[in-house]
Amino acid sequence: MAASLQQEFCALRDTYIEKQFGRLNDMQRQAVFTTDGPLLILAGAGSGKTTVLVNRIANLIRFGSAHGSDWTPREVTEEDVKDLKTAIMTGTDAPARLDGMLRQNAVRSWNVMAITFTNKAAGEPKERLRNMLGGEEGDEVFASTFHSACVRILRRWAESIGYPRSFTIYDTDDSQRVMKAVYKELSIDDKFFPIKSAINQMSRWKDQLVSPEEALRTPARDTKGAIAAKVYAAYEKKLREAGAFDFDDLIYQTVQLLAEHEDVREFYQNKYRYLLVDEYQDTSVAQFRLVSLLTGPEKNICVVGDDDQSIYRFRGATIENILNFERIFPGTKTIRLEQNYRSTSNILNAANCVIQHNTERKGKTLWTRNDEGDKVQVYTAENEQDEAMHIADVIGEHLKEGGHLADHAVLYRMNAQSAPIESYFTRAGIPHKIVGGQRFNDRKEVKDIHSYMSIVANARDDVRLRRIINEPARKIGNTTVDVIADLAAQQGISMLEVISHADAYAKLSRAIMPLLKFWQIYEKLQESLETRTLDEFAQDVIEVTGYKAMLEADAAKGHEDAADRLQNLGQLVNNVKNYCDQHGEDASLEGYLEDIALISDIDSYNESADQVVLMTIHSAKGLEFPYVFLIGMEEGVFPSEMSKYSEADLEEERRLAYVGITRAKKELYISNSVSRMLYGRTQRNEPSRFLREIEPEYIEETRSPALERRSSMGWGSSYSDTVPGGASGYSGASGWGRNSSSFGGRTGGSYLNREYNASERGGFGSGYAGRGSSASGFSSGSSAPRTSGSSGFGVGYGRPAAPKAASKPVSFPGSPAASRPASTGPKHYEVGDIVEHKVFGRGKVLAVKAAAGDQIVEINFEKVGVKKTMANFAPLTKITEE
């Protein structure tokens, strides 16, 4: 009887636990209920990996390994069975008295560590766990980025490796300042071996866990390699003297700490019994070593990643970490999450087509129960301006249908591609945001105030001291600063300590007064930190240093940016106050400086702002948008020119394309351009091989009206001078005719699907007149001329008769689409004019400024507030004048 009750209760317990995770699919539940030993979760794009991570943590805390177990902590009673049945049937919580019976080896929330790459990704699980487990349990889970986790460890144990617990974290600018000092000391010519190259080499060494001593011992390949090793050692010496770590040090030094101090290592292994790592495919050698050192003897490590989305090789990531996980951790259970909840099936099929051409992968195929959706729209532009106009047209159509600007993202391979889009959007008055532009904390005035705050937190921070000692101007020149640095080095003390006794040094006699005044400022700031709140301290820094007075004086003189810089300092104080509100009693100056040092570009992205988002594909990792524009799909651009010489690099480019494609939820627009200017040079590139890898059934192709006109008239394209086989060259094929009979008796295709090795295939593929074939604008498989809207070469897939998107110029907020027809002459507006915008509605002109034959018009719209736009581009109608 007892045995049967035990079995019945355990079966009911499984059912009860499964109902708690009823929204998960079968594979997700399997990942959640696999609790012990190494676990590899291969999570495809949009497969709900964050949901799995959160639910797995919740299961570890609420139920432990109870699911699937036949063990109970005490003998089961009939009442236990009855109460559990009732809870299952009614969908209510089981009685509190059964809590112990529903758990097995459950852990406390503070025994779990979850590590990922971005603050956003680290914050989301904590928020969801608060909702699932309650505030206290959710808050106790340590969810953090790699770097934040390392800072937390170092704050406690830094003295064990010779650093102060109040260490400073240097950013890129700080590192360059240190390196400049090293170059000066070692008499190294920056032109022979650029500082940036030295810093990059140092970063690679730290990612590979190569110490300065090892770098010096290893025979250098050339003179530059020997120089790099010397500056690495000198650079690290300066950082140690300053009590500072650079960004790469945070992981590198934590690994050294854990590897060399068994007591510290065991402390964390015992504290965090379960370790979960997200985005494992992007980990470096140093990050892998860190994870290994944190993993306890039970090997309760779960890594979540997607080898198909490993895109950070240039930052030191190694895909081998995820590919070799099962070998490194014997007994690993591998679970694949392949059901996608984000995208339409057409978008997923396009992504699968591309990624299956890679060989270095575990292998999986995404699928979805979502609708088939629209086909992927492929647009061939005449140039980058045409590409920008096409994007604006499509967005305008979506807005007409009730869409929002924030639903749209323009993604590109490299930052330089954003310039034409940004320029066009700005002229057209299209609200947009570039993610990855200058960050707030990188503005000069903000960095200056943060530097003041930093030297108060860490008196050894000579780099930040150098930055602000004469900012605002105090008659403390570079010569004086160099003397201070020499005196400090001779005595083994900080520069600030020398300044505090400036009157004791004859070499500083000419600068005694300004130096002692600076020391008085420093003492006032120290007192402020001890007696006032952190945001009040920030305000004091701005005022006591004279920085506010300097900017106010600049504003009075009419300096254009002074008012903006003052506003930025006001925002800085607000940011400090927000930090204090979030951290309560735990708020500290060191903590605030730590937070700003660890902010990434994507952390500043505001999803609630109604703007079109422009960003690199790398920045878009982990994000999703209803409408995605993937631009510049051309050979030499995407994939990049350099990647074509390395199979490993080419596979990384293909993974990057896969990431870009899978950001789209509803519709995906891919564009390539016949002609593109990059870095001041116009280049003509073939369409990307990644386009040709997509099966034709998943796409629709349209082309620029200019290319259509050229095609219909039998003219060659702007490619003609690069094409072997004739002057006319490409004459406007428009379909994805992969199965058509084409040049030289080979199977051809559309313009986008032409082959590379023309000499080997008897023709240059589709789109070009190949060797031995006519270049007059006719298919070798037909005697009829090609015309606009024809089916491409031979009998291939034709372009749609009526393209889905941008079939005609559309009215967008400031869209220049209306300017494509013949101009009706320049528009003229005056202050007080009442105007009607086709999307923004009615508004009043507040200001007008002449600009190169046009006007910049500032309008207060009744619906959307104040906007600026170019008069000749905006779809405005003057209603009346006041």
Model feature map: region roles:
Residues M1-P164, I169, E266, E320, ...:
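P-loop NTPase Walker
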Residues R23, D70, D80, A87-A96, ...:
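Conserved helicase/translocase P-loop NTPase motor core
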Residues F33, G37, Q104-S109, Q256-L275, ...:
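Short basic/glycine-enriched coil/helix segment immediately N-terminal to the Walker B
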Residues T35, F117, E137-V141, A158-D249, ...:
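ATP-hydrolysis module of ASCE/P-loop NTPase motor domains
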Residues S47, Q281-E360, K364-R369, D486-A489, ...:
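Conserved helicase motor core of SF1/SF2 NTP-dependent helicases
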Residues T50-L53, G68, T77, I88-R103, ...:
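Helicase P-loop NTPase motor core
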Residues R217-R221, H404, S418-I430, R443, ...:
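Conserved helicase C-terminal RecA-like lobe
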Residues M633-G865, F873-E882:
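C-terminal accessory regions
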